[in-house]
Amino acid sequence: MTQPDLLGTPEFERAGVAILRGFALTDDMALVAAIDAIVANAPFRHMTVPGGGRMSVAMTNAGIGWVADTKGYRYDRTDPLSGQPWPDMPSIFVDLARRAAHEAGFNFAPDGCLINRYEPGAKMGLHQDINEGDYSAPIVSVSLGLPATFQFGGLKRNDPVEKIALHHGDVVVWGGPARKSFHGVLTLKAGHHAIGGHRYNLTFRKVSPP
């Protein structure tokens, strides 16, 4: 199946959702270099959820950071491992997120980027992004590296879920009536890509209130 074969499924012909195939390809290696620079100051770590479990996805942040621990889920400007502010978002991050959002019909000024690293066997359960202070802003999600199966549902956990293959350089934008949709990633399969045997996901959000 080619990437064009995956376009235009009925589930995503709806207000607020855009799948931008290959949108980040021209910036891919610069994005990876920016990730490496961030990780040098704020290493990847496996966060703990309130129930005590350990997330299979390794995470770090730029800008205002998303944090999970036994106390709950929240945003914090400080990296709890170092006690220092999270690294600033590189200009290439901000520019890409703004351009992708504009392509999808949104104005967007992100102030937080959660960086996820999926190794084979890692996954992300269905969830909503609801810890932010500005639901009028969209979510912009960038895929780099190994392909993954993205799950995108409705506003209720038991709503039907669409499975869609995401490839290196693809960007998904959702906002408006779809802003609080449940979404997740199925278990990553082993493979090889030019950037390595893993997948990066950059999730851009507007954390601060409007």
Which residues does each PLM region occupy?
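Non-heme Fe(II) oxygenase metal-center motifs and adjacent flexible, charged/small-residue loops
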Residues: 1-210
